[in-house]
Amino acid sequence: MSDTLRVAGGAVLHPDFTVSDGDVLVDRDAGEIIAVGDTPAGDETVDAAGCLVMPGLVNAHCHVAMTLLRGYADDKQLDAWLQEDIWPAEAELADGDIRAGARLGLVEMIRAGTTAFADMYFEVPEVVDAITEAGLRARVGHGVVTVGKDDADAVADNEEALSVAREFNDAADGRITSAYMPHSLTTVGEEYLREFVAAAREADVPVHFHANETEQEVEPIVDEHGSRPLEYAADVGLLAEDDFLAHGVHTTAGEIELLAESGASVVHCPASNMKLASGMAPVQAMREAGVTVALGTDGAASNNDLDVFDELRDAAMLGKLQTGAADAVPARAAVEMATAGGAAALGFDSGRIEVGANADLAVVDFDAPHLTPVHDHVSHLAYAATGQDVRHTICDGEVLMRDREVLPFDEAAVREQAAQRASELAARAGE
């Protein structure tokens, strides 16, 4: 007899974006949804009265431990921000810092209804420990940089990434999977990119990388290889169906065609792109071409939070601003990118509420002035709701937040430890 959980008394957001009153019944042993609508009682009940039950949000590009650097350096272009502030600070990270930063970020995401994410960083075992403790779903990888390193260090970094991808591809009973994660097309040499591709195809895991984030990133690739970044990526073997890239801000029509033909996905990070003045990704054009587009926060150092509700609102607004068309990236498209689009990009069977899907749910409390009246639930998700409106968060059938109390962690202790470590890190880095 399976152990069941019923999310009862709310309205349910269906895959076709219709909304109806009903319950969601979850098999906690399997971590799956087993009934929607009129359901039998469960062994345990989560009260969703006055709420909308929606798929858990997917943060498809993140550097979760960078919460320690939230507010550390602002109001700079990407290259200066990285070279003058972030990379020197990261060089001073001590043992345990990344675990502490990751735990803080996981608490923040659970609070905001995120149930799955992709994370590119280093000291991945520390991040995996924190994710395992949190109960979230994730695809993880070691972010490799080989350019500017001597051969021995470059080889070691590359080997670390390959090892991490092998070790964590089915961790935490399958909730945690891996990807090969070369940082970008300009920070990883061509021979290492080709090695990544060969290893990824042999292991049947995707590749995740930054691409076309800034104009400054595009120029050296054109100069060195005589091709656009995604043309170069395709030439070295990237852009397979399961691969996913972050940003894609300066992606041309020809590159969009390459993406559509390949089946590779793009993770749009609107807040980070605005804050670093990187530009606006051509999301409407990508979607019209059939490219899967997901949403990501990027790291908290360049955002400066991990609230995917902010991203879906920004995505909808920027789509209109960029095209001059008010119907570009409509509310439904933005919510889809934050749920089913993210799940598709990361290869998870979540992002929708239907029988057989992963039981990853966010219960959004609509009993608030800014969510009243309710003419259209989806409109409110895109244009009015924030992560603070989430009342319960459920991942893999387990309740991670009930009535706004995060259950896997002592939240006060997590915040205190992260604040202390961030202060010590800043002192070492000479802030």
UniProtKB/Swiss-Prot annotation:
GO terms for molecular function: 5'-methylthioadenosine deaminase activity; metal ion binding; S-adenosylhomocysteine deaminase activity. It catalyses: S-adenosyl-L-homocysteine + H2O + H(+) = S-inosyl-L-homocysteine + NH4(+); S-methyl-5'-thioadenosine + H2O + H(+) = S-methyl-5'-thioinosine + NH4(+). The keyword rRNA processing does not apply. Binds 1 zinc ion per subunit. Substrate binds at residues 90, 183, 213, 298. InterPro entries: Amidohydro-rel, Deaminase_MtaD/DadD, Metal-dep_hydrolase_composite, Metal_Hydrolase, MTA/SAH_deaminase. It comes from the Archaea. Keywords: Hydrolase, Metal-binding, Zinc. Its cofactor is Zn(2+). It is an enzyme of class 3 (hydrolase). Its EC number is 3.5.4.28, 3.5.4.31. Zn(2+) binds at residues 61, 63, 210, 298. Catalyzes the deamination of 5-methylthioadenosine and S-adenosyl-L-homocysteine into 5-methylthioinosine and S-inosyl-L-homocysteine, respectively. Is also able to deaminate adenosine. Belongs to the metallo-dependent hydrolases superfamily. MTA/SAH deaminase family. PANTHER family: AMIDOHYDROLASE-RELATED DOMAIN-CONTAINING PROTEIN, AMINOHYDROLASE SSNA-RELATED. This is 5-methylthioadenosine/S-adenosylhomocysteine deaminase. The gene is mtaD.
